[in-house]
């Protein structure tokens, strides 16, 4: 009788422990899921007046636009918060999607000057757009502090066997970068840089029809900022090397985390709603 009672007590204790472990795992999974799949949303206002793409973002419409300021590490909230702020706004009219970004940056640095250079080898700002919102075909635009652009089209994500088309160009794109400091000069501390981009709707389409905004159906969109660890190099900068004599891995700071170091997961991007 006594041995049976002891057995029952041990089983009860074991079940209680398993219940605690289960609840802990569920809670952790919930937190992780909410941090990685928050599906952030943005409502872009339609503007009636022409916007001058000058990099200043001084128009009244820009001041009225909703601010994105909650960039995170691409892997999610479990990683350290970005060291520098990144603020983004969006607007639209009948022809363009306007994107304005202000990037805090104490060391303005850029080396790539040729169109379609691999811009993420510098500090950069990146835009990913899926106009259909289906997680398939999408477009990528990157720009550095020198105003150099790289753009490409993906027929589908890499994990689905997709390939990139670097020959695709964002025909008619308007862009301007303003450096608030001195580029490639380590003798001072800079404030940052401002990016203003106008993306023609007719450019981000693989058909004769423009990617027309819908007030009902959102697009998928995400923003990324690639940030390298630098060290002085004469009067300029260079990437700091690790113990294996290779550049220290870059930081990837994004609007909507994908959970892994991979931006090419459009189903994990945020939503862009067009507001009239």
Language model region names:
Residues 29-276:
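Structural preference for beta-rich elements and adjacent junctions enriched in aromatics
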């Amino acid at each position: 009788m006594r041995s049976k009672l002891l057995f029952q007590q041990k089983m009860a204790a074991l079940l209680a422990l398993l219940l605690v472990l289960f609840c802990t795992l569920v809670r952790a999974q919930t937190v992780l899921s909410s941090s990685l799949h928050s599906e952030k949303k943005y409502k872009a206002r339609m503007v009636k007046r022409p916007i001058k793409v000058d990099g200043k973002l001084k128009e009244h419409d820009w001041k009225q636009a909703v601010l994105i300021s909650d960039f995170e590490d691409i892997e999610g909230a479990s990683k350290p918060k970005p060291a520098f702020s990144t603020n983004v706004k969006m607007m639209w009219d009948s022809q363009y999607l306007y994107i304005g970004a202000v990037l805090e940056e104490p060391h303005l640095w850029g080396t790539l000057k040729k169109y379609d250079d691999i811009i993420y080898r510098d500090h950069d700002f990146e835009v990913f757009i899926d106009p259909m919102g289906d997680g398939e075909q999408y477009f990528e635009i990157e720009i550095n502090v020198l105003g150099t652009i790289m753009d490409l089209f993906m027929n589908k994500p890499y994990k689905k066997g997709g390939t990139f088309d670097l020959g695709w160009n964002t025909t008619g794109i308007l862009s301007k970068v303003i450096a608030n400091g001195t580029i490639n000069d380590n003798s001072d501390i800079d404030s940052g840089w401002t990016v203003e981009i106008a993306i023609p709707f007719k450019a981000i389409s693989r058909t004769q029809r423009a990617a027309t905004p819908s007030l009902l159906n959102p697009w998928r969109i995400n923003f990324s900022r690639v940030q390298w660890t630098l060290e002085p190099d004469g009067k300029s900068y260079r990437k700091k090397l690790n113990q294996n004599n290779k550049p220290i891995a870059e930081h990837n700071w994004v609007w909507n985390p994908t959970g892994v170091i991979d931006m090419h997961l459009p189903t994990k991007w945020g939503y862009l709603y067009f507001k009239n």
